[in-house]
A protein has these predicted regions:
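Short glycine/proline-rich, acidic loop/turn segments that cap or connect secondary-structure elements
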Residues: 236-253
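A short aromatic-rich beta-strand->coil structural motif
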Residues: 114, 159, 253-254, 273
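Extracellular/periplasmic catalytic domains that process cell-envelope and extracellular macromolecules
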Residues: 5-6, 150-153, 246-247
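C-terminal active-site "lid" helix and adjoining low-complexity regulatory extension at the edge
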Residues: 215, 246, 260-262, 268-280
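A long, amphipathic alpha-helix that forms part
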Residues: 1-60, 266-276
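Secreted, luminal/periplasmic, and some membrane-associated catalytic domains
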Residues: 47-235
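Short glycine-rich loop/turn motifs
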Residues: 9-13, 111, 249-252
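Short, histidine-centered active-site or binding-site loop motifs used for metal coordination
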Residues: 18-20, 251, 255-259
Length: 281
Protein backbone atom coordinates (compact mmCIF):
# COMPACT_ATOMS: atom_id res chain seq x y z
CA UNK A 1 0.00 0.00 0.00
CA UNK A 2 2.85 2.38 0.85
CA UNK A 3 4.57 1.57 -2.44
CA UNK A 4 1.40 2.37 -4.38
CA UNK A 5 1.03 5.73 -2.66
CA UNK A 6 4.66 6.84 -2.71
CA UNK A 7 6.12 5.33 -5.88
CA UNK A 8 3.03 5.21 -8.14
CA UNK A 9 4.24 2.24 -10.26
CA UNK A 10 2.69 1.72 -13.69
CA UNK A 11 2.28 -1.98 -12.87
CA UNK A 12 2.57 -3.70 -9.52
CA UNK A 13 2.24 -7.46 -8.97
CA UNK A 14 1.22 -8.41 -5.43
CA UNK A 15 1.18 -11.97 -4.11
CA UNK A 16 -1.16 -12.75 -1.23
CA UNK A 17 -0.40 -16.28 0.06
CA UNK A 18 -3.32 -16.74 2.43
CA UNK A 19 -5.14 -19.34 0.31
CA UNK A 20 -1.95 -21.09 -0.78
CA UNK A 21 0.12 -22.37 2.13
CA UNK A 22 -2.42 -24.06 4.39
CA UNK A 23 -4.26 -25.89 1.57
CA UNK A 24 -0.91 -27.23 0.40
CA UNK A 25 0.04 -28.40 3.87
CA UNK A 26 -3.26 -29.75 5.13
CA UNK A 27 -5.38 -30.10 1.99
CA UNK A 28 -8.56 -28.16 1.32
CA UNK A 29 -10.61 -30.39 3.60
CA UNK A 30 -8.06 -30.03 6.37
CA UNK A 31 -7.82 -26.23 6.25
CA UNK A 32 -9.96 -23.64 7.98
CA UNK A 33 -11.02 -21.95 4.75
CA UNK A 34 -13.44 -19.39 6.29
CA UNK A 35 -10.65 -18.16 8.57
CA UNK A 36 -8.19 -17.97 5.67
CA UNK A 37 -10.67 -16.00 3.56
CA UNK A 38 -11.21 -13.54 6.42
CA UNK A 39 -7.45 -13.08 6.73
CA UNK A 40 -7.20 -12.53 2.99
CA UNK A 41 -9.98 -9.94 3.09
CA UNK A 42 -8.18 -8.09 5.88
CA UNK A 43 -4.94 -8.07 3.87
CA UNK A 44 -6.76 -6.73 0.79
CA UNK A 45 -8.30 -3.72 2.54
CA UNK A 46 -5.17 -1.50 2.70
CA UNK A 47 -4.20 -2.46 -0.85
CA UNK A 48 -7.64 -1.65 -2.25
CA UNK A 49 -7.78 1.60 -0.29
CA UNK A 50 -4.40 2.67 -1.67
CA UNK A 51 -5.37 1.66 -5.20
CA UNK A 52 -8.56 3.70 -4.99
CA UNK A 53 -6.65 6.67 -3.59
CA UNK A 54 -4.17 6.78 -6.49
CA UNK A 55 -6.69 5.80 -9.16
CA UNK A 56 -5.18 2.39 -9.92
CA UNK A 57 -7.17 -0.36 -11.59
CA UNK A 58 -7.18 -3.67 -9.75
CA UNK A 59 -7.19 -7.15 -11.24
CA UNK A 60 -7.37 -10.33 -9.21
CA UNK A 61 -5.83 -13.46 -10.66
CA UNK A 62 -5.66 -16.91 -9.11
CA UNK A 63 -3.34 -19.46 -10.69
CA UNK A 64 -4.94 -22.66 -9.46
CA UNK A 65 -7.33 -24.38 -7.12
CA UNK A 66 -6.05 -26.95 -4.64
CA UNK A 67 -7.18 -30.52 -4.17
CA UNK A 68 -6.66 -33.09 -1.43
CA UNK A 69 -3.90 -35.64 -2.04
CA UNK A 70 -2.76 -38.69 -0.11
CA UNK A 71 0.13 -40.15 -2.09
CA UNK A 72 3.57 -38.80 -3.09
CA UNK A 73 4.95 -40.34 -6.28
CA UNK A 74 8.73 -40.65 -6.74
CA UNK A 75 9.52 -40.61 -10.46
CA UNK A 76 13.25 -40.08 -9.98
CA UNK A 77 13.50 -43.12 -7.75
CA UNK A 78 11.72 -45.19 -10.39
CA UNK A 79 14.13 -43.94 -13.04
CA UNK A 80 17.07 -44.76 -10.79
CA UNK A 81 15.87 -48.28 -10.10
CA UNK A 82 15.53 -48.74 -13.86
CA UNK A 83 19.16 -47.71 -14.36
CA UNK A 84 18.23 -44.47 -16.12
CA UNK A 85 19.15 -41.93 -13.42
CA UNK A 86 22.59 -41.49 -11.89
CA UNK A 87 23.60 -39.92 -8.59
CA UNK A 88 27.10 -39.37 -7.25
CA UNK A 89 28.21 -39.54 -3.67
CA UNK A 90 29.52 -36.24 -2.37
CA UNK A 91 30.82 -35.06 0.99
CA UNK A 92 27.32 -33.93 1.98
CA UNK A 93 25.18 -36.73 0.57
CA UNK A 94 24.12 -37.95 -2.85
CA UNK A 95 23.81 -35.40 -5.65
CA UNK A 96 21.78 -35.89 -8.82
CA UNK A 97 24.11 -36.25 -11.82
CA UNK A 98 22.05 -34.54 -14.50
CA UNK A 99 24.76 -34.85 -17.16
CA UNK A 100 25.43 -38.50 -16.38
CA UNK A 101 21.77 -39.49 -16.21
CA UNK A 102 19.94 -40.88 -19.20
CA UNK A 103 16.75 -39.37 -17.79
CA UNK A 104 15.59 -37.38 -14.77
CA UNK A 105 12.37 -35.68 -13.69
CA UNK A 106 11.78 -32.10 -12.61
CA UNK A 107 8.66 -32.22 -10.46
CA UNK A 108 6.12 -29.49 -9.79
CA UNK A 109 3.07 -30.53 -7.80
CA UNK A 110 0.97 -32.80 -10.05
CA UNK A 111 3.04 -32.30 -13.20
CA UNK A 112 6.57 -33.39 -14.06
CA UNK A 113 8.91 -32.77 -16.97
CA UNK A 114 11.15 -35.75 -17.71
CA UNK A 115 14.31 -34.82 -19.58
CA UNK A 116 15.86 -37.59 -21.70
CA UNK A 117 19.45 -37.27 -22.91
CA UNK A 118 19.20 -39.65 -25.88
CA UNK A 119 16.00 -39.46 -27.90
CA UNK A 120 16.29 -43.17 -28.59
CA UNK A 121 15.60 -43.78 -24.88
CA UNK A 122 12.24 -41.96 -24.91
CA UNK A 123 10.09 -45.09 -25.41
CA UNK A 124 11.85 -46.92 -22.57
CA UNK A 125 11.64 -43.94 -20.22
CA UNK A 126 7.98 -43.37 -21.06
CA UNK A 127 7.24 -47.02 -20.29
CA UNK A 128 9.00 -46.81 -16.92
CA UNK A 129 7.11 -43.64 -15.99
CA UNK A 130 3.74 -44.99 -17.10
CA UNK A 131 4.14 -48.05 -14.86
CA UNK A 132 4.63 -46.02 -11.66
CA UNK A 133 1.64 -46.13 -9.31
CA UNK A 134 0.05 -42.69 -9.10
CA UNK A 135 0.92 -41.60 -12.65
CA UNK A 136 -2.25 -40.70 -14.53
CA UNK A 137 -1.12 -39.66 -18.02
CA UNK A 138 2.13 -39.58 -19.99
CA UNK A 139 2.72 -37.30 -22.99
CA UNK A 140 5.60 -37.29 -25.46
CA UNK A 141 6.32 -35.79 -28.85
CA UNK A 142 3.38 -33.97 -30.40
CA UNK A 143 1.12 -35.32 -27.65
CA UNK A 144 2.49 -32.58 -25.39
CA UNK A 145 0.63 -30.07 -27.53
CA UNK A 146 -2.61 -31.47 -26.14
CA UNK A 147 -1.77 -29.81 -22.81
CA UNK A 148 0.02 -26.75 -24.22
CA UNK A 149 3.52 -27.96 -23.40
CA UNK A 150 5.00 -28.81 -26.79
CA UNK A 151 7.76 -26.22 -26.65
CA UNK A 152 11.55 -26.27 -26.56
CA UNK A 153 11.89 -25.98 -22.79
CA UNK A 154 9.55 -28.84 -21.99
CA UNK A 155 10.88 -32.21 -21.04
CA UNK A 156 10.92 -34.85 -23.73
CA UNK A 157 8.17 -36.47 -21.67
CA UNK A 158 5.52 -34.80 -19.51
CA UNK A 159 3.66 -36.73 -16.82
CA UNK A 160 0.48 -35.87 -14.93
CA UNK A 161 -0.36 -37.56 -11.66
CA UNK A 162 -3.60 -39.19 -10.66
CA UNK A 163 -6.03 -36.93 -8.80
CA UNK A 164 -5.06 -38.14 -5.31
CA UNK A 165 -1.31 -38.04 -5.98
CA UNK A 166 1.54 -35.59 -6.53
CA UNK A 167 5.15 -35.81 -7.72
CA UNK A 168 7.94 -35.59 -5.13
CA UNK A 169 11.47 -34.86 -6.37
CA UNK A 170 13.72 -37.18 -4.23
CA UNK A 171 16.08 -39.45 -6.15
CA UNK A 172 17.96 -41.12 -3.27
CA UNK A 173 16.88 -44.57 -2.15
CA UNK A 174 17.97 -44.26 1.48
CA UNK A 175 17.28 -41.18 3.62
CA UNK A 176 20.69 -41.53 5.27
CA UNK A 177 22.16 -40.70 1.84
CA UNK A 178 19.97 -37.64 1.23
CA UNK A 179 21.95 -34.48 0.38
CA UNK A 180 22.28 -31.95 3.17
CA UNK A 181 20.19 -29.39 1.27
CA UNK A 182 17.20 -31.76 1.26
CA UNK A 183 16.47 -30.78 4.88
CA UNK A 184 16.66 -27.06 4.12
CA UNK A 185 14.76 -24.48 2.10
CA UNK A 186 16.74 -24.59 -1.15
CA UNK A 187 14.79 -23.90 -4.33
CA UNK A 188 17.82 -23.98 -6.63
CA UNK A 189 19.49 -27.32 -5.91
CA UNK A 190 16.36 -29.43 -5.67
CA UNK A 191 15.12 -30.79 -9.03
CA UNK A 192 11.60 -29.62 -8.46
CA UNK A 193 9.32 -27.88 -6.01
CA UNK A 194 9.41 -29.28 -2.48
CA UNK A 195 6.22 -28.61 -0.46
CA UNK A 196 7.91 -30.23 2.55
CA UNK A 197 9.57 -26.82 2.95
CA UNK A 198 6.25 -25.61 4.35
CA UNK A 199 6.78 -27.85 7.40
CA UNK A 200 9.14 -28.06 10.34
CA UNK A 201 10.31 -31.63 10.88
CA UNK A 202 7.96 -33.08 13.53
CA UNK A 203 10.70 -35.48 14.68
CA UNK A 204 12.78 -32.55 16.01
CA UNK A 205 11.96 -32.32 19.71
CA UNK A 206 12.94 -28.67 20.18
CA UNK A 207 12.82 -26.97 16.76
CA UNK A 208 13.11 -23.43 18.12
CA UNK A 209 16.28 -24.38 19.97
CA UNK A 210 17.74 -25.82 16.78
CA UNK A 211 16.91 -22.67 14.84
CA UNK A 212 18.53 -20.47 17.50
CA UNK A 213 21.65 -22.65 17.57
CA UNK A 214 21.94 -22.47 13.78
CA UNK A 215 21.59 -18.68 13.89
CA UNK A 216 24.38 -18.45 16.46
CA UNK A 217 26.66 -20.68 14.36
CA UNK A 218 25.98 -18.55 11.30
CA UNK A 219 26.77 -15.35 13.22
CA UNK A 220 30.08 -16.92 14.30
CA UNK A 221 30.99 -17.55 10.67
CA UNK A 222 30.52 -21.32 10.50
CA UNK A 223 29.06 -23.11 7.49
CA UNK A 224 25.51 -23.57 8.70
CA UNK A 225 22.44 -25.28 7.31
CA UNK A 226 18.99 -24.62 8.71
CA UNK A 227 18.19 -28.32 8.57
CA UNK A 228 14.66 -28.28 9.95
CA UNK A 229 12.71 -29.51 6.90
CA UNK A 230 11.25 -33.05 7.00
CA UNK A 231 11.95 -35.68 4.34
CA UNK A 232 8.55 -37.31 4.84
CA UNK A 233 6.56 -36.28 1.75
CA UNK A 234 3.55 -38.06 3.21
CA UNK A 235 2.98 -34.98 5.38
CA UNK A 236 1.76 -33.05 2.32
CA UNK A 237 -2.03 -33.21 1.97
CA UNK A 238 -2.75 -30.68 -0.79
CA UNK A 239 -1.58 -30.09 -4.35
CA UNK A 240 -2.62 -28.75 -7.75
CA UNK A 241 -1.77 -28.96 -11.43
CA UNK A 242 -4.44 -31.14 -13.01
CA UNK A 243 -7.28 -29.75 -15.11
CA UNK A 244 -10.27 -29.13 -12.86
CA UNK A 245 -13.43 -30.74 -14.22
CA UNK A 246 -15.64 -28.67 -11.89
CA UNK A 247 -15.67 -24.96 -12.93
CA UNK A 248 -15.85 -23.99 -9.25
CA UNK A 249 -12.37 -25.45 -8.77
CA UNK A 250 -10.74 -23.54 -11.62
CA UNK A 251 -8.67 -20.33 -11.41
CA UNK A 252 -10.47 -17.01 -11.54
CA UNK A 253 -9.86 -13.62 -13.15
CA UNK A 254 -11.63 -10.61 -11.63
CA UNK A 255 -11.33 -7.11 -13.03
CA UNK A 256 -13.15 -4.14 -14.51
CA UNK A 257 -13.95 -3.20 -18.09
CA UNK A 258 -15.24 -5.46 -20.84
CA UNK A 259 -15.44 -9.11 -19.85
CA UNK A 260 -13.03 -11.32 -21.82
CA UNK A 261 -14.15 -14.45 -23.57
CA UNK A 262 -14.90 -17.42 -21.37
CA UNK A 263 -12.54 -20.39 -21.08
CA UNK A 264 -9.38 -18.35 -21.35
CA UNK A 265 -6.02 -20.06 -21.46
CA UNK A 266 -3.70 -18.79 -18.74
CA UNK A 267 -1.29 -17.17 -21.20
CA UNK A 268 -4.11 -14.85 -22.34
CA UNK A 269 -4.03 -13.04 -19.00
CA UNK A 270 -0.84 -11.17 -19.91
CA UNK A 271 -2.39 -9.58 -23.00
CA UNK A 272 -5.56 -8.65 -21.11
CA UNK A 273 -3.55 -6.84 -18.45
CA UNK A 274 -1.26 -5.16 -20.97
CA UNK A 275 -4.25 -3.89 -22.92
CA UNK A 276 -5.77 -2.50 -19.73
CA UNK A 277 -2.44 -0.87 -18.84
CA UNK A 278 -1.83 0.68 -22.25
CA UNK A 279 -5.40 1.86 -22.80
CA UNK A 280 -6.12 3.44 -19.45
CA UNK A 281 -6.56 6.86 -20.93
Amino acid sequence: ATLLREERPELSLVYLPHLDYDPQKFGVSGSDMPRLVRELDAACIPLLDAAKEVGARVWIVSEYGHCDVSRPVYLNRALRLAGLLSARQGPFGEVLDTFGSRAFAVCDHQLAHIYVRDLADIPQVAEVISQVDGVGQVFRGEQKGDIGLDHERSGEIVALSEADSWFAYPYWLDDTLAPDFARTVDIHRKPGYDPCELFIDPTIRFPKSRIVSRLIRKKLGFRTLFDIIPLDAGLVKGSHGLYAADPDDRPILVGDGNAPASHLVMTDVRDILLEALLNQG
